[in-house]
Amino acid sequence: MMYINKGKRDILIFPQFTNIGKIENIRKQYDELYEVLPPHIPLAFPFESSMSNDELKNRLMQVSKSLAPFEIIMSGVSLHEDKKANTNYIFLDVMSGVKELKMLHNKIYETVLEHQTNFEYIPHITLGTTEKDHIEFELNDVFKTVITKISIEEIGENEESNVIFEINL
């Protein structure tokens, strides 16, 4: 495994599903980061910044003031091609809560990180990768929880997640 994100930070949600074990079982087979990073919904992808952790926390607290906890429902899987890496990502799809997640993502990039993204944000949990053009398993379960906080992590030596702080919604 190539460790390309070591030392970077990212902003994400660690959802607390009662049936999260089903997600973990699939990730164990398809996701090389299974052992070092719990299932998560990315809000800001790994980034480098000279901004201190305190400043980052203060900016995120300003964003979170306008937000309340919200429910998400996830179900279904989809493939998303990464032409640069010559692979397909397997996503667990968000069915409800998409609007809130996209708004949060956009606010983070616009007001916290102060730049625009040049891609369409698709809220999801990455279940893994495959070189195949189809998914070889079924996942018909529904995953439901209330999102109450966002996490900021620093990515460690072996791509492990080191949560620096969390912000309550």
PLM ranges: what are they?
Residues M1-L169:
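Histidine-dependent nucleotide/RNA phosphoesterase domain, centered on the 2H-phosphoesterase fold
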